[in-house]
Amino acid sequence: MNHKNVLAVDFGASSGRVMLGNFDGNRISIQELHRFPNDPVILNGTMYWDFLRLFFEVKQGLIKAKKYGKIDSIGVDTWGVDFGLIDKEGNLLENPVHYRDARTVGMLEKSFSKMDKDRFYQITGSQFMEINTVFQLMALMEKRPGLLERASRLLMMPDLFNYYLCGAQVSEYSIASTTQMLDARTKMWSKEVLESLGIPERILGSIVPCGTRLGLMKNGICQELGIEPGEVIAVAGHDTQSALAAVPARDKDFIFISCGTWSLFGTELDEPVINGLSKKLNITNEGGCQGKISFLKNIIGLWLIQESRRQWIREGKEYSFGHLEQMAADAKPFKALIDPDAPAFVPAGNIPERIRRCCRESGQRVPGNEAELVRCIDESLAFKYRMTLDEIKMCTGREYPAIHMVGGGTQSRLLCQMTANACHCPVIAGPVEATVLGNAALQLLAAGELRNLDQVRNVVEASAKVSIYEPEDTNQWDQVYGQYKKMFAADGGSYL
C-alpha cells in the first residue's frame, strides 16, 4: 500500500509540537518537525494565550513538512477548557484567556446561586473546577459583557485552530465536554444549564464527533506556504482523549493515567456514571472517541515539579528533570506528604515554599532541600493516584488488572514505580508520545485506513515501546497510605 503522511499538531500547556506521522499499513512512525514554547502573556493584569504566535508556529511546521511530500491530513489537539471568541466577520475578538487567570475566582459558588449543584452535576456529570469554560463565561458576562455581545461564535482551542485552517466553525465532542455545558447523556449542549446561568446558546456551534472530516486547508494558507492542500480532521481535540485512543490496552476494563502537567486518571466506559457517590467524589464524565466516556479525575500532576524547577532556576539552580529525579530517588522516603490538588498549588509561583508552608501547617516534618521536595511531590502523586483508583472502583464496581500510564510522566521511572507500589497494581508505562500517536491514528481512522478504536490501539501497540513496573514494598506503602487518607481524603477516608 501507499504510505500515508499525517501531521499531528499537539499543544500542551507549556510547549507545542508539529509531528509527522507516517503509516506503512502496520505501524506509525513519528518524527518531530517543529517544537516551540507556549508561554502565556500577562497584559493589563490578564493572562492570555498568544494565539497569533501559535498559529504562526503551526505554519512553520507545515513549511518544514514540505520536504516529506504531500501531507494527506492534519489534526490539532490542545489542553481543555479554554476558548476564543469570533465576531460575525469571522475575526478573533481577542487572544484567548488562560485558564490560570484569576477571573474565575468565586464563580463556582455564584453558579450554585443560579443553579442547584446536584442538578448541575446530574446533567453534565462534570467535575467542578473553577477553570472550566462555563465559569470562565460567567466571569466574562460579569466583568466584560460587551465582549460576549459582540461574539458570534465560541470556539474551543482546537476548534479555533481548525477554523483558521479550513473555515469550519464546529465544536468537536471531546473538547466540548470539558466546558461543563454539555449534557453527558445526550452529548448535546444543555439548554437547562445555559438558560440557568444566562449563557447565550447562539454562540455555541454544532457538535461533531471525533474523526469528522472538516474540509481542505484554505487556499490562502496553501498559497502563502507553497503547499498542497491537506484535509483538516477533527481528531479528539482534548489532548487527553487523543492520548487515551493510544492506550495499548487489551482488556476492556483498564485504568489509564495521562501524565503531564495534569494527571488525568480514569477508565473508559460505554455510558456515563452519574450518581450521588460520583458527585461526592467529584469525578467527571468526559467525552471520548467513538462515543466512549472517560470516567476520570483531573489531578494536578507534573506542574508541581515543573513550577518548582522554574523557581529553582530563578534562584540560580539549573537542575535537569533527570537530575531532580535521581536526587529524589536517593532521598529518605515518606518524610512529608501533600494533597497535589490543594488550591495553593494552582497558581504559578514559588511552589517549594508553598509545599513547606502546607507541611508546617499540617504538623509534618518540613522538606528541606530540593531532593526532599521532589520526593514529597512524587510520593504524594502516587498516593493521590491510589485514592482515585479506590474511588473509581467504588463507583464502577469493577476491578482493574493494570494501570496504563502514558505521556511525558512515563519518563520518570521513579514515579512509575511509586505508582505501582502505592496502587498494588502493575503499571504499563508508555507510549511517551501517546497524544501524538493517538492524534495521528485518529486521522487514519477518519480516512478509512483503520476501522475502529481497537485497531487504532493495535497499531499503536505495534508502533511504540512500553515498560512494565511491578509493585514492590506494598506493606510499607499501605501503612503510609492509611495516614495519607486520614490527612487528605474527605471524612478521613472512611468511605474508602
Stretches found by the model and what they are:
Residues 1-94, 122, 150, 222-232, ...:
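N-terminal glycine/serine-rich phosphate-binding loop of ATP-dependent small-molecule kinases
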Residues 2, 7-8, 20, 112-124, ...:
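Active-site core segments that coordinate phosphate-bearing ligands/cofactors
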Residues 38-44, 119-120, 170-177, 200-203, ...:
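Gly-rich Lys/Arg/Thr-decorated short loops/hinges at beta-loop-alpha junctions or inter-strand turns
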Residues 47-55, 126, 130, 207-211, ...:
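Short acidic-aromatic active-site loops that bind/stabilize oxyanions
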Residues 63-98, 127-131, 158, 162-183, ...:
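Short beta-strand-loop/turn "lid" adjacent to the catalytic site in phosphate-handling enzymes
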Residues 70-78, 153, 206, 398-407:
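Short glycine-rich phosphate-binding loop at a beta-alpha junction
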Residues 77-80, 210-211, 259-262, 402-410:
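Glycine-rich beta-strand-to-loop/alpha-helix junction loops that act as flexible
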Residues 101:
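Carbohydrate-associated surface elements
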